[in-house]
C-alpha cells in the first residue's frame, strides 16, 4: 500500500457496497483480519472473481481499515489517566458522561473500547469546558463569557471588515521518514482568487521551479531531491474582506442561474441524497418554499442537532453528512457538508469553502459552507461557529453566522474533493480538503503520522 499508486477518482467508490465478509469484520472492529480478507479477495484465484470496479473498491477499503486500526489505539484506562492528570478524581463514570455527550471519538474493536489518538486532546482542549469546570467546582454552574462582537459592529457601521494577513507555512517528512536523495513532492495551501480575497502575494518559496495552481484546491507545488532536515516552505500575504449583507425573507427570490445548477447535484461519495437525508430535508422544509427560509431551517437544525467534536480523518468515513445527522456530532467540515447536502436536496445551490481560520495570533484549520439566494448571491453559513455561539448563549453571533461571516479566514479551497495540481501519485493525506499540505516521495506514500508541518501568522492588520 505504501508503494502502490492511487487513482484519485476511485475515492468516489466509498459509496459502493462491500462483500459481506468485509462488512462483518469491519463492524466487529477486526481490522487486521479485514485487511487479510481484502488480500484474499484480491487474489485472482479467489471466488468470485471481481471486476476492476470492485477491485478498486477493495483497495480503497485497505486505507479505511488500516487507518482505523492505527488511529484507534488509546484504551479506556489510558484515556481516564490522561484526563485525571489535569482533573484529579476523574473516573470511568465521568468518561461515560463525556462519551454520551458526543465529545469522545471511539470505536468498539476486537480488543475492546478504543479511542482515537487525539480524542484526549479534544476533550481537554475546551470542547468539554462546561463539564470539566463543573467537575472541578462541585455545586457551581459554568457560565461562558460573551464579549462584544467587534466584527459585527464594524460591518454594520461601515459595510465591510477587511484584514490583511502574512502567513508562513512549511511541511517536511519527520525524522523517521527522511530519505536522503529521494525525490520529494510537496504541496502547500495558497489563497484562492475568490470574491472574499484580494491582494494575494507569494512573498517567498524555499525551492525554485515551483508551480502555483489555480485549481479548486489551490496550492504552491515543488519537487526536489530531499536532504535531511529540509523543509518545503512558503510565505504569502492576502486581504480577506467580509461585506455586510442585510437579509430579508421578504426580499428573497428562488431564481437559480443555469450555471449554478451543478451546485444542486450529488457528488459521490459524500454529497449523496440518501433516503434518510431526503426525508429529513422534507421534514425540515414542511410546506415552506422560500429558499432563504428553508436554508435557515437547515442552519438551525445543524447548529442545534450537531455538537462540535474532533473527527477522524475524513477518508475514514463512508458518508460524512449521514454520520453527522445520525450521530449528532461532527467538526466544522462535517457540519458544513450536512448543511450543503440538505440545501442541494432542496434545490438551493450550496458549496464548500475551506482553508484556515486566521486571527492576529494563530492559524487553525477551518471549513464552512456557502449557499446561493437571490438577490444577494452567495451567502456564508458557518455551522460550527454558529453552533458554538448558540450553546454559549450568543444569539447575535448565531444569527449573524447565517448569511454573513468575518474576515479572519484564509481560503484555500473553493470546492470539496478536487484533485491536487499536479496530481498526487499516492493517496492524499486528505482527499477532500487541503489545510496543512500534501507530501509524498516519488515512490512512497506518507501519512499524517509521517510528517511535520507548521503554519503561523507573521503579521496581521486591519485594512480600512
Indicate where each model-derived feature is located.
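TPR-adjacent "capping" and linker segments in tetratricopeptide-repeat scaffold/adaptor proteins
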Residues: 2-17
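Hydrophobic/aromatic-rich core segments of domains that either
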Residues: 15-28, 334-424
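Solenoid-repeat scaffolds in large eukaryotic assemblies
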Residues: 31-41
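Intrinsically disordered, low-complexity N-terminal segments that are enriched in acidic
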Residues: 27, 40-244
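Active-site nucleophilic cysteine motif
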Residues: 291-298, 328-343
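Terminal peptide-recognition signature
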Residues: 186, 298, 369
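Low-complexity, Gly/Ser/Thr/Pro-rich intrinsically disordered linker/tail segments
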Residues: 403-464
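Acidic low-complexity segments
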Residues: 18-19, 26-33, 214-216, 228-326
